Structures are given as C-alpha cells and as structure tokens.
Curated annotation (Swiss-Prot):
SUPFAM superfamilies: Restriction endonuclease-like (SSF52980). This is DNA mismatch repair protein MutH. One of its GO terms (molecular function) is DNA binding. Keywords: Cytoplasm, DNA damage, DNA repair, Endonuclease, Hydrolase, Nuclease. It comes from the Bacteria. Belongs to the MutH family. Gene3D superfamilies: DNA mismatch repair MutH/Restriction endonuclease, type II. It comes from Yersinia pestis.
Amino acid sequence: MSVYSLPPAPPSDEHQLFQRAQALSGFTLGELATRAQWVIPADLKRVKGWVGMLLEFYLGASAGSKPEQDFADIGIELKTIPISAQGKPLETTFVCVAPLTGNSGVTWESSHVRHKLARVLWVPVEGERHIPLAERRVGAPLLWSPNVEEEELLRRDWEELMDLIVLGKVESITARHGQVLQLRPKAANSRALTEAIGEFGQPIMTLPRGFYLKKTLTAPMLARHFLL
C-alpha cells in the first residue's frame, strides 16, 4: 500500500480517488483498521456503517452523512457493497433518506437520489457471515454512472414511490414496490418518528424512510464489471 499520511487530503480528481481505492484492494478490514488505529468491532450489528467509514477515512471523504456526495468536490458518492464468494451482492444498498413532506414540485432531475447516484465509486467487500469481520477482504473498485436503461428504471420507481408519499400512502409502501429502487423504514429504534402526510392529507408521525437500491440493479452491474 502506498504510504500516504492518514487521513489523506480529499482526492483532487476521479483518477486519484480510483487509484486510492485500487490500492486498498486485497487488504483485509483488520489490516486497514490496525494501520488506521481503529478498533475493530466484533460484528456490524450495532455499527452498520463501520466498513464505509473506514474506507472513507482511507480515501479522504469529506461529506460524512450530509446529503451531498461523499466526494462533493469531484461529484462522486462512495458505496461499499458486501458480496458473496460468487461476486453477488448480499444486501440492498442505502442511497439516502426519503423526504416525506414538502415534496410539491419535486422532480427526478432535482432529486437527492439522482444526485447521489450520478457517479458512484463501488467498493465490493467480502460479506459472508462465516468470515470474521477482520478477515474480510476489500475487492477491486468500480466507477459507475447509470446507463440509459438503469436511469429510466430508477426514475420510474422513484416517481411511483414519491407519488405514493405525496398521496398520503407512505404507510402502504412495502419493500416489494419498485423494480430496482425500494423505500423502507430506516431507524435504529421504533421510537424515532418523523412527520409525514396521512391518507386524508393530515400530518402523521411515522418511521423515517430510506431509498435503497435492490439487488436487481446491483447484481447485473457487478456481473458486468467482474465478467461473471
């Protein structure tokens, strides 16, 4: 691994970011955590975003959990994706929190989802549960932008889900809605409620929701990348 100081300055361009990600390929999470002097959790149950934060640290990300992209200056979002030994994604991928109020006039073109997914650096990480967290290896990175077909599928799903939110049907949306994009509750506990619109236009309190990419989008994308 190149011996740049940690944490490095934010990358100046896409090429530098990709080079940094390539340099991490093949290392275990334990090796990277030890070098960064990070404590390795026993598992990810209580610290779901730990892998992403560790890689952000090495890559020089600046946004944290703000709504902008992780590498806002160069317009790139970082997404780690746990994969099986066959290179298939093991879970859905969080994109961003869904706005449940104040959505009049919002369009796909101006949406957070589209902004976050415009350019993504995907970093696959071994994710099978029998592999201890410290022994899981980082895979080869992939820079991706949605192609015409993927963008159309994302737009269609987003518009359908946003229509349901605006019409006060947020509580009837299930993870089965959407071909490649789903909406589901995102909260560590069921007491963290947020305001939304009810069926009759009245304010209601409900669990915060997040947009997630389904494996129907990420599996073919990884298969093309790794020629599976």
